[in-house]
Amino acid sequence: MNQFHDDALSAQACPLGEDAQQIAEQLRNFGDTRQVLSQWSFAPALNQLGLPQRYQTSAHHQVRDLAARYALYEQVGFVSPALMFSAPGPSMAAYVVAGLGNEQQQDAFFGQFQKALCWSCFAMTEPAQGSDAGALQTTATAVDGGFLVSGSKMFIGNGMVAETGVLFARTAPGQLGINAFLFNPQDPAITRQRLALTGLDGTNLAHMQFDKLFIPTGNLLGQHLKPTQRFAQSAMATFNALRPCVGALALGVARRALHEWQTCVTPTPTQAQLLSRLKRRWHTAHHEGLTVCQQTDEHQPSTATPGMVKTACVIIAEEIVSQLIHAFPADHGPLPTALWQAFRDVKAFEYTEGTRQIHRLSQSFSFPHASQEHQ
């Protein structure tokens, strides 16, 4: 096996369409997100990724469980992670609406993705507080018929193009005062600014400023639930599901780097040994992440927390890309663009769905409880 791209793994997951690479290149050139992605043959499948089964209108490329989603994310990461970050679909918001929304709210939200390609966003992270949701400063003040939202959000994926989404804001002090709302990101009361990036070219992350945005009472999610069930239930369901998938994206980037390196270089015996070690580490990380996803699907105790799965995958991916760059022969000319691209892109995953520092702290706090469960 000369190229990691030819591994049997490549044939197992959903095909992304023969046009995936072309679409990724157009997106990296900062083409209009909606216009470029609308041309992708696989976009309709991603547009329904995460929809509850009763809202899915096509059986084509349905991803029904977390393990299948993990495999799909790795495949997308191999082509370009920017495709996933820029894709249409309910994305992270799907978990919140499915968990907290009443029937009318779910029909209104998920129905948008049945009609046409639709982009969504998940507005939680703030400039001063980061993803420390318990310290949210964005406020939702009750008024006649609804709420007025003021504050700001940062690093909001698809924030420039989203037509719908979920917004987290504080209606009262304390942990129980945090609530989730359906909102329209295109409302004129929201000022949006696209953020400059050094990696993931084509991805649109936005800073969003809310100036007394009116949200009707009917858009408050979880009104039929106890306050103790609202925020924690929606946030943890989202993060636990998607953190391993972020790790899979990183592994996809690393696998592409391995493929590109071997395309350019005929390895010496020493380099072949290095490649063999890197591939073994890749397969180990990929298998461990897939195992946790399968355990989640089967409602079994997990061998690792979702946060640590993501952390382990990202660390391995970073190390693979870095070692490949250092091992690239100097006499082969400039480093290939694809390797520099992988180097920039893989750094982004550290800051996606929580840094490794946060996940390690979380693991240390929860480890005794996890150990007792397995005894």
Language-model features and meaning:
Residues 1-88, 367-375:
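Amphipathic, small/basic residue-rich leader segments at the start of a protein or domain
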Residues 2-4, 9, 328-375:
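Glycine-rich phosphate/cofactor-binding loops in nucleotide/flavin-utilizing enzymes
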Residues 81-104:
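N-terminal glycine-rich flavin-associated loop
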Residues 138-141:
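A structural signal for short hydrophobic beta-strand segments in well-ordered beta-sheet cores
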Residues 25-36, 262-270, 282-336:
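C-terminal helix-coil-helix/basic helical segment that borders enzyme active sites and/or dimer interfaces
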Residues 115-125:
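A short, Trp-centered hydrophobic/proline-enriched beta-strand micro-motif
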Residues 152-190:
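A short core secondary-structure module
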Residues 194-286:
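Glycine-rich beta->alpha junctions and the first turn(s) of the following alpha-helix
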